[in-house]
Amino acid sequence: PPEYEHPFTVDVMPVVRQADNSLLIPSTRTRQWSTANPEYLIEQVRLHHEDWSFFRPIVRVLKNWRTGVTSETRIKSLVMEVLALQCLPRSGSRPEALRQFFTAAAVQVNLGVEDPAGHCGLIQPDLDTAALRDALLDAADLADRACDQAARNDTDGAQRTWQELFGPDFPAPAKRTGPRAPAAPVPLITDSPQG
């Protein structure tokens, strides 16, 4: 039921299928019919995932990340899915893909996030673009730091930085509370004559 903390809901609406496979959907706001083709988006997601098997899991991570963005309006999950289609690579490691996504999406969001099928225009006309862009830029900085830490073999630091970006649900080692243990002394080896 909707009154639960995490309800499972399904939206159902009447549609009329057109000859080109697009759908006519009634809009109560405009009192007109809107054209859409959700099957196009589904196919694009399938193709991207076929090329890079981490696509769908990363999209889920990004949709969860958006809920922590402070914004005048709630960011629709479809906005994140379309940005992922536009900005996630089709190969590579997950950390590098996230780094690339946040950097590219911070630019892309300024151009508007539109229906990839070309029917509806902007997906979320009331999107707080400035807030989302700022959050994407901050995320890009954190992703850069995490990737740089990993490149320096500071995996604990990298994991903590990813946790800073994605929240406490992201697993990371505990922060050090004391100084590092000193390195064991290196014995002095001298070359002395034998015999």
Where are these regions (language model features)?
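Conserved catalytic core of two-metal-ion nucleotidyltransferases
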Residues: 1-23
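Histidine (H) residue identity feature
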Residues: 6, 48-49, 119
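Long, contiguous, structured domain-core segments that constitute the functional module of a protein
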Residues: 16-71
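Conserved nucleotidyltransferase catalytic core and NTase-mimicking acidic/glycine-rich helix/loop elements
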Residues: 54-165
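Non-catalytic terminal regions of proteins
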Residues: 159-195
